Amino acid sequence: PTGSGKPSLLNVLSGRVPAGGILSGEVTVNGQARSEDFNERVAYVMQEELLFAFLTVHETFMLHARLRLPPSTPDKEKAESVDRLIAELGLKNVRDSPVGSPGGFRRGLSGGERKRCNIGVEMVHDPAAIFLDEPTSGLDSFQAQNVMSALRDLAGNGRSVVCTIHQPRSSIFAMFDQLMLLTDGRLAFIGDASAAVGYFETLMFKCPTLTNPADFFMDVMSMDFRSESREGNSRSRVDFFAREAASRGLGEAAASKALESVALAKRQGAFDGEKEETTSAKSPGGAGWATQFYLLSQRAHKCQRRDVVGVGVTVFLDVVYALLLSALYRGVGDDQEGVQNRLGCLFFICLNLAYSSALPSINLFAAEKNIVIREQASGAYATSAYYLSKLVAELPKLSSKFVFCTLVYWIVGFNPDPTRYLNFLLIVICEC
């Protein structure tokens, strides 16, 4: 249920405890402590789809493949890997379509396609396990079914898929192999998903016939705060589930069963610890700094070039403001009043350049902040490479400032000496 601690548990399991968070106990993988490169071996997909609207699905995947796969991997092999992943996620029909943005501001993928694209971004380095925070959130039942079917296929290809989910439909619930039920931050059940209904029957809570088990679990495990009596009853019920799970040792039994499965796989030769240690993470370290800078610069230039409306509006406003400013100060004299007017004109030039240069950049960094945080948490690139790539990508925008300053300079009638004009432009460029 809502507020049961699902995202917190997922963050702990995936090794992404927020800064300042306090963790007691330990997390083990196959009975052993997590290795230093654990985060490189797993993928974490956030609930929010954090993607660049102007890139296509293929471009998005290829960028992350080039950033996160080893430099020794040929581009042809990376492209083939990306195409296989696109096919696995059912995105072949939108391979070359722009991702777009939610709400239809920039048209692109549907909600379910965006979810699958968001998953694919974290799958390009072929992780051994993938953690997902409510991958069906905000989707209709059909799109949710498609997303979970894609995840089921990924699990069938030898990957471990761990996801939190809120009130799935019955057909989605039937896809689960293992199930953990949390209530009020405590364990209520863990084990085979097919055994959950029977377990609750032993507690005298029987799932009605023709009822979705997930809906039944939500009903009996949720806290009801509509009145004190209902809160007390639901609190007693939740405490009962937590006590029973603890007294029956469900957590210990599930852990023991998992370790037995690993031991059996080792005996049968299906699991080679040494081999897994060297091959489960394909990326011992992705692209170098120079490659990161080049790829991020390419991405920034593509997004800027394809934002036709944004670029057009910027140029249009610069030209309009230049003409208005020129109309106000055109033909000023060389007397004391004219000098003061020229100083006023220069002040407005500086003011326009300062605001028109700074505000778009501030808005851009704010818009991309969450994407960058997600990508850096995955180890995609260095902060310095991203920052410098954005600076380089902003250079073409100086052309509109060049037009603005040129129009104002010559229409108003500043010093016609070419050297003075070039000095003026140099100062303007430095200010931008």
Each model region followed by its residue ranges:
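Topological signature of polytopic alpha-helical transporters
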Residues: 1-2, 24-26, 31, 46, ...
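Conserved catalytic motifs of ABC-family nucleotide-binding domains
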Residues: 4, 36-37, 48-59, 72-73
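Helix-to-loop junction immediately C-terminal to a conserved catalytic motif
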Residues: 11-17
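Alpha-helical transmembrane segments and their short interhelical loops
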Residues: 157, 163-164, 169-173, 178-181, ...
